[in-house]
C-alpha cells in the first residue's frame, strides 16, 4: 500500500469521528434538554481532542513527504493537496488549545441562548471574553505559520485563497452603490400595497408547507430530515443531512425562506462526489461556495416569480388568507426594509449586515479593538450603514448571531461572497437554460443538473477560482451581483 492510499484510509477514519461530531452537534441544537449541556460539552470536547490527535499523528508528516514523490493522477494530486491542507490546519494548534476552545465555545453558545433573550450583555461578555482570547491565540498561531495577518489566517480556514485585502476592495465597492440602491428601492416600493402576515399560522402547517417546498426542490428525504432549532442551520453529513428552521406562529415568512435557504446547503451536501466521501476533496469547496448554493436557492430561485407561483399554490393547501396570493407573496419576498436582524434581512440590505460584521471581526482578530468595544462599534456602523441605533439593544445588535459565540471568526464574509457567486452562476446558467420556463414547469431538474455538473460533483478537487472560472468563464466578478440587484429592485 503506497503512502497516498494510507493517507486516504486515515482520512476516512477521521471522517467517521467527524460524522459523529456533526450528529451530536445537531442533537445539541435541536433536541437536547437544557440540563444536558455541561456533560455534552465535555463529551464533544473529548471527541474533538480525539479527532485532533488523529489528524496530528507524527507519522503523517512522513506519509505526506512520501506521497508527494509518488506518481499520482490529477485527481489524486488534488486529493493529496486537500488532505495536506487539512493536516496543516490541524497540526498548527496544540491539543490544549483545541480542548479549551471547544469547552469555552460550548459554554458560551449554550448560555447565549438565554442571555440573548434577556438582553444580558454583561453575562454574555464574561463567557465571550474567553472565546475571543482563545480565538486570538489561534489566529496568531495560524498567522505566524502562514506569514499573514491574524484575521487572514482565520479567513483561510473558511475561504482558502481569500484575503482581507481582496474583501476590502470588494466591500468598499459595494459600499459606494448599495446605500443609494436601498433608498431608491424603498422609495419605489412606497406605493406597493402589501398585505403582511396578520393571523395565526400554526407551526405544524408551516412545517407541512416547508416539506412540500423541499420536495419541489428535490431534497432527498432518504438521506436527510427537517427539524426545529433556535438558529436555522444545515448540519450532518452528505448521507444524513440535518436541516433546521424556526417557526413563529404570528408569521410564516422566515420559516419558509429559511427552509429554502437550508435546502440549498443540503442539496450541495447531498450532491458531493460519493467516490470521494470521507476525504477533504469530497467536501464543499469553501463556505462562500456553500453559501452560494443556499443563496442560489433562496434568492435566485426562491424569489423568482415563477417559483413564487408554486409557493402560492402549495400554500393554498394549508392556508386560506389573501396574503398568500401570488402577487402579494412576490411583494412580501422582495420587500426592502432596513432592520436590525441579519437572518431576517431582505436581499438588498443583507450585504450591509455582513460588511458590518466583517469589519468588526477583522479588527477584533487583528487586535485593533477589544471585545468590550463591540457594542459601541456595532451601534456606530448600524447607524452609518442602515440608519438604525442599537444602543443598549444587545439582543438585536451584537448578540444576535451564533457565529461569534463559539469563535467562528472569519465566516461572515462567506454570506456576501456567496450572494455574489450565486448571481454569477445564474448569469452563466441563463446562457444555456431557460430558467424561468424550467421553474414554471415545476420540474427543476435542468437547474439542478447544471449545479451538479458545475459545482456539487466537483467537491474540492478545484480551487475556488478554478471552480468559478470553469463554471462561468471568469473568476469572481461582483458586477453580476450589482446587475442582479438593480434588475430586481429598480
Where are these regions (language model features)?
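Divalent metal-coordination and catalytic microenvironments
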Residues: 7, 143, 261, 294, ...
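Post-HExxH zinc-binding segment in Zn-dependent metallohydrolases
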Residues: 283-324
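All-alpha helical catalytic cores of prenyl diphosphate-utilizing isoprenoid enzymes
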Residues: 171, 175-178, 203-207, 213-227, ...
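C-terminal, non-catalytic "cap/extension" segments appended to globular domains
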Residues: 3, 25, 29, 35, ...
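Secondary-structure capping and boundary motifs in well-ordered enzyme cores
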Residues: 39, 100, 127-130, 170, ...
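Active-site recognition of the HExxH zinc-binding catalytic motif
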Residues: 254-273, 291-295
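A well-structured
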Residues: 1-160, 486-490
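Contiguous, non-catalytic segments that form substrate-binding/exosite surfaces or channel walls
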Residues: 101-252
Amino acid at each position: 500500500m503506497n503512502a497516498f492510499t494510507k493517507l486516504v484510509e486515515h482520512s476516512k477514519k477521521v471522517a467517521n469521528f467527524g460524522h459523529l461530531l456533526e450528529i451530536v452537534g445537531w442533537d445539541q441544537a435541536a433536541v437536547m434538554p437544557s440540563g444536558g449541556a455541561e456533560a455534552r460539552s465535555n463529551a464533544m470536547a473529548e471527541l474533538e481532542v480525539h479527532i485532533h490527535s488523529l489528524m496530528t499523528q507524527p507519522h503523517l508528516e512522513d506519509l505526506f513527504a512520501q506521497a508527494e514523490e509518488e506518481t499520482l493522477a490529477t485527481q489524486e494530486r488534488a486529493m493529496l493537496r486537500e488532505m495536506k491542507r487539512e493536516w496543516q490546519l490541524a497540526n498548527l494548534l496544540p491539543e490544549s488549545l483545541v480542548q479549551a476552545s471547544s469547552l469555552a465555545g460550548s459554554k458560551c453558545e449554550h448560555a447565549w441562548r438565554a442571555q440573548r433573550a434577556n438582553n444580558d450583555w454583561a453575562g454574555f461578555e464574561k463567557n465571550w471574553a474567553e472565546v475571543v482570547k482563545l480565538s486570538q491565540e489561534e489566529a496568531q498561531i495560524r498567522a505566524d505559520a502562514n506569514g499573514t495577518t491574524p484575521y487572514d489566517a482565520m479567513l483561510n480556514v473558511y475561504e482558502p485563497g481569500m484575503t482581507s485585502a481582496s474583501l476590502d476592495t470588494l466591500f468598499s465597492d459595494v459600499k459606494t452603490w448599495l446605500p443609494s440602491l436601498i433608498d431608491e428601492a424603498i422609495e419605489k416600493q412606497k406605493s406597493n400595497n402589501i398585505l403582511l402576515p396578520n393571523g395565526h399560522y400554526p407551526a405544524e402547517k408551516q412545517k407541512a408547507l416547508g416539506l412540500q417546498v423541499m420536495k419541489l426542490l428535490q431534497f432527498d428525504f432518504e438521506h436527510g430530515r427537517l427539524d426545529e432549532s433556535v438558529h436555522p442551520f444545515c448540519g450532518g453529513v452528505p448521507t444524513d443531512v440535518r436541516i433546521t428552521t424556526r417557526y413563529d406562529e404570528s408569521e410564516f415568512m422566515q420559516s419558509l425562506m429559511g427552509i429554502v435557504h437550508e435546502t440549498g446547503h443540503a442539496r450541495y451536501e447531498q450532491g458531493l462526489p460519493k467516490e470521494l466521501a470521507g476525504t477533504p476533496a469530497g467536501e464543499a469547496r469553501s463556505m462562500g461556495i456553500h453559501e452560494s448554493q443556499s443563496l442560489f436557492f433562496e434568492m435566485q430561485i426562491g424569489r423568482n416569480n415563477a417559483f413564487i407561483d408554486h409557493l402560492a399554490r402549495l400554500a393554498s393547501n394549508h392556508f386560506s388568507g389573501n396574503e398568500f396570493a401570488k402577487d402579494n407573496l412576490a411583494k412580501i419576498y422582495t420587500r426592502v426594509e432596513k432592520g436590525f436582524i441579519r437572518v431576517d434581512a431582505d436581499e438588498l440590505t443583507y450585504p450591509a449586515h455582513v460588511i458590518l460584521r466583517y469589519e468588526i471581526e477583522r479588527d477584533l482578530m487583528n487586535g485593533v479593538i477589544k471585545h468590550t468595544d463591540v457594542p459601541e462599534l456595532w451601534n456606530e456602523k448600524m447607524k452609518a450603514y442602515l440608519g438604525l441605533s442599537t444602543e443598549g439593544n444587545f439582543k438585536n445588535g451584537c448578540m444576535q448571531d451564533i457565529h461569534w459565540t463559539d469563535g467562528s471568526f472569519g465566516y461572515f464574509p462567506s454570506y456576501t461572497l456567496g450572494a455574489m457567486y450565486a448571481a454569477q452562476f445564474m448569469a452563466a446558467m441563463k446562457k444555456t437554460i431557460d430558467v424561468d420556463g424550467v421553474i414554471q414547469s415545476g420540474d427543476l431538474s435542468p437547474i439542478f443538473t447544471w449545479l451538479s455538473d458545475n459545482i456539487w460533483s466537483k467537491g474540492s478537487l478545484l480551487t475556488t477560482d478554478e471552480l468559478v472560472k470553469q463554471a462561468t468563464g471568469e473568476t469572481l466578478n461582483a458586477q453580476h451581483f450589482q446587475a442582479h440587484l438593480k434588475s430586481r429592485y429598480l
